[in-house]
Amino acid sequence: MKKIKQKFSWEKAKDVATADFLAEEVFERDSYEHVYPVQEGDVVLDLGASLGPFTWKIMDKASKVYTVEPMIDLIPTIEKNTEGFPVTIINAALSHNNGEIEFNDNCVNDFKPKMVRTIDFKTLLKENNIDKIDFIKTDCEGGEYALINDVNLPWIKENVRNIVGEWHVGEKLQQIEFKYFRDKFLPQFKNFEIYSIDNHSIKWDLYNDHFLEHYTQILIYIEV
């Protein structure tokens, strides 16, 4: 197993607070591997990589990492952080459709919106010759629904082991989307756990609308 020698670079982070939040989430709380860890030799898909902290954390264990990030300004930092490891960087945003969209990332030190490429999941698989994924991490501001849906679910159930994602539920529309996803798709998996951002189990709270309204972001861990 190749050891990571380069220090993680926070170049292009919006500010110190943003860097601190990402560092705490990925490195200190171990949020994305809290329930299901990445295993030696896994093929990993990192959706919404930002500066690449999760990719950097697991790239010495994975046999291959596909790192997806829509903001072109962040790509050089991701390249620097992952140099020498089996990481393919894809400059795009996961979406229901292929095309372009105006996009702004609040983790970047430039608030000007930019046009970014959008790519659907099946195109992502085809363009990168992906035939299986052991572990998917997703934090892509609603792109989770472009991943887990009726079109993609059959492939996912045959070819993916675990999915870990951050869902946003702070707004009314987000809560409606989440409840539909919760009731239709989550029961189709072998197991799932739901945690608050600070790593407290809230699986059954999320079936109570009163409790749901108290959360803005949640983490879902899925055993496919």
How would you label these PLM feature ranges?
Residues 1-224:
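Phosphate/nucleotide-binding beta-alpha loop and adjacent structural elements of enzyme active sites
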